């Protein structure tokens, strides 16, 4: 059933639908019936809307048309009963407060009110005298006066909060400037310390490092090794090429005419701590770089370099080169 639609004639055995309602039976031509229903709902002007009945013709109780009894009045003194629409009072309050709001705002912004607010903020004890003008007059009891007083209180509270906010900003601003002035020295004092240089690095090298114009040199505590894209070295600690152990063993076994024992090499390697192997970039056989054996061999070779090469040394070198050509596939690693 749809309200506001046209009424169709009903069957003889059925009750007629209520006034303003329509019963649609979808039997054969559903499209036509649905279109009729749609037009009736979308165009209610063409529908038969019942007219409003007067109060005397409506089905109302008899007590509605009689005067109330004396005990049923809302005011027992004068025996009267009245009812007023509450919306009228709201509209009257709005109409009263609308023209009076600009003078209130203008009065609040006067220098006298500003001085009173400043005195109330500086001396809280004097706040009751400053708020005395806000109290409503004794003769004003209407709703318009209460609304105006409430609006004035809200405006004064808003102005007081604004002044308090400005005062807080003025107090915080010097502290903020003082903190900002202290931040650069703190950053300079808390800068990263210079790395501890070893005894082998000279003072000139440290001066060049500290006074360098390159911004990347002084950016951190120490330099970090970056990955290279063209040298074939990665960031891992095993990227540095090493001499195979088989090659060193074969060289030690050669007959070079000097009594070099096998125990000298491990003693040189054991002089360095084991934790150096775990550091990145230190996976190098440090025993071959420097040592007592290197110094001894250098001292022994210095006087012999001025002498002519003997045939025994040449024969030994040919033997070594021949052995190297035969076994180079087993111990040489080409990079």
UniProtKB/Swiss-Prot annotation:
Phosphorylated by lats1 and lats2; leading to cytoplasmic translocation and inactivation. GO terms for cellular component: bicellular tight junction; cell-cell junction; cytoplasm; nucleus; plasma membrane. GO terms for biological process: hippo signaling; positive regulation of transcription by RNA polymerase II. Residues 1-13 have a biased composition (Low complexity). The keyword Glycoprotein does not apply. InterPro entries: TEADIR3_omega_loop (IPR053819), YAP1 (IPR051583). Keywords: Activator, Cell junction, Cell membrane, Coiled coil, Cytoplasm, Membrane, Nucleus, Phosphoprotein, Repeat, Repressor, Tight junction, Transcription, Transcription regulation. Residues 145-173 form a coiled coil. Residues 137-335 are annotated as: Transactivation domain. Residues 1-21, 114-146 are annotated as: Disordered. Residues 114-124 have a biased composition (Polar residues). Transcriptional regulator which can act both as a coactivator and a corepressor and is the critical downstream regulatory target in the Hippo signaling pathway that plays a pivotal role in organ size control and tumor suppression by restricting proliferation and promoting apoptosis. Plays a key role in tissue tension and 3D tissue shape by regulating cortical actomyosin network formation. This is Transcriptional coactivator YAP1-B. It comes from Xenopus laevis. The gene is yap1-b.
């Amino acid at each position: 059933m749809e309200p506001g639609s046209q009424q169709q004639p009903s069957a003889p055995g059925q009750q007629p639908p209520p006034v303003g309602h329509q019963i649609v039976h979808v039997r054969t031509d559903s499209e036509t019936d649905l279109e009729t229903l749609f037009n009736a709902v979308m165009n209610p002007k063409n529908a038969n809307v019942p007219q409003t009945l007067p109060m005397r013709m409506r089905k109302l109780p008899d007590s509605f048309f009689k005067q109330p009894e004396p005990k049923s009045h809302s005011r027992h003194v004068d025996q009267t009963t009245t009812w007023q629409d509450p919306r009228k009072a709201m509209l009257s309050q709005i109409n009263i407060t609308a023209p009076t709001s600009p003078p209130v705002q203008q009065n609040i912004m006067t220098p006298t009110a500003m001085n009173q607010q400043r005195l109330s903020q500086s001396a809280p004890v004097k706040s009751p005298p400053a708020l005395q003008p806000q109290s409503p007059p004794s003769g004003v009891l209407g709703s318009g006066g209460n609304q105006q007083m409430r609006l004035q209180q809200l405006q004064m509270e808003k102005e007081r909060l604004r002044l308090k906010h400005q005062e807080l900003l003025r107090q915080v601003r010097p502290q903020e400037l003082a903190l900002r002035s202290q931040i650069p020295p703190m950053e300079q004092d808390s800068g990263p310390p210079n790395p501890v240089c070893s005894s082998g690095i000279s003072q000139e090298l440290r001066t060049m490092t500290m006074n360098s114009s390159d911004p990347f040199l002084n950016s951190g505590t120490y330099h970090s090794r970056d990955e290279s894209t063209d040298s074939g070295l990665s960031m891992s600690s095993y990227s540095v090429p090493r001499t195979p152990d088989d090659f060193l063993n074969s060289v030690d076994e050669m007959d070079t005419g000097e009594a070099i024992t096998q125990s000298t090499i491990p003693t040189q390697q054991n002089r360095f701590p084991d934790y150096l192997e775990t550091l990145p970039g230190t996976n190098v056989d440090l025993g071959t770089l420097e040592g007592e054996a290197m110094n001894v061999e250098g001292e022994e070779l210095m006087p012999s370099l001025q002498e002519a090469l003997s045939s025994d040394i040449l024969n030994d070198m040919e033997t070594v080169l021949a052995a190297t050509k035969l076994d180079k596939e087993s111990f040489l690693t080409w990079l």
